[in-house]
Amino acid sequence: VEILLGGEDGSLAFIPSNFSVPSGEKITFKNNAGFPHNVVFDEDEVPSGVDSAKISMSEDDLLNAPGETYSVTLTESGTYKFYCSPHQGAGMVGKVTVN
């Protein structure tokens, strides 16, 4: 499944921002805009036992150019919340449910 970082209209958002995947399906986050974005999973908002650092980009690492991607595969069932660290304050947050 492919998730876009940034809307065609320049909005600071994950598109879609709320989605579900089967366990083990690769999720690819793709920068869709000229702004630097990243993907960080909230350590308090992932299933118990999941190390958020292992599935997140570093807070300092950014997808700077349109078309740059970051992929992750989630295997533990449950709900994961994530955000873009530069734009979290602007509401750039999302949620994935792993079935």
Curated annotation (Swiss-Prot):
Residues 1-99 form the Plastocyanin-like domain. Its cofactor is Cu(2+). One of its GO terms (cellular component) is chloroplast thylakoid lumen. It holds the Pfam family Copper-bind. Changing residue 17 to G: In 50% of the molecules. The keyword Transmembrane helix does not apply. Its main location: plastid. Keywords: Chloroplast, Copper, Electron transport, Membrane, Metal-binding, Plastid, Thylakoid, Transport. It is a peripheral membrane protein. It is found in: Plastid, Chloroplast thylakoid membrane. The keyword Plastid applies. Cu cation binds at residues 37, 84, 87, 92. GO terms for molecular function: copper ion binding; electron transporter, transferring electrons from cytochrome b6/f complex of photosystem II activity. InterPro entries: BlueCu_1, BlueCu_1_BS, Copper_blue_Plastocyanin, Cupredoxin, Plastocyanin. SUPFAM superfamilies: Cupredoxins (SSF49503). Participates in electron transfer between P700 and the cytochrome b6-f complex in photosystem I. Belongs to the plastocyanin family. NCBIfam families: cyanin_plasto (TIGR02656). This is Plastocyanin. The gene is PETE.
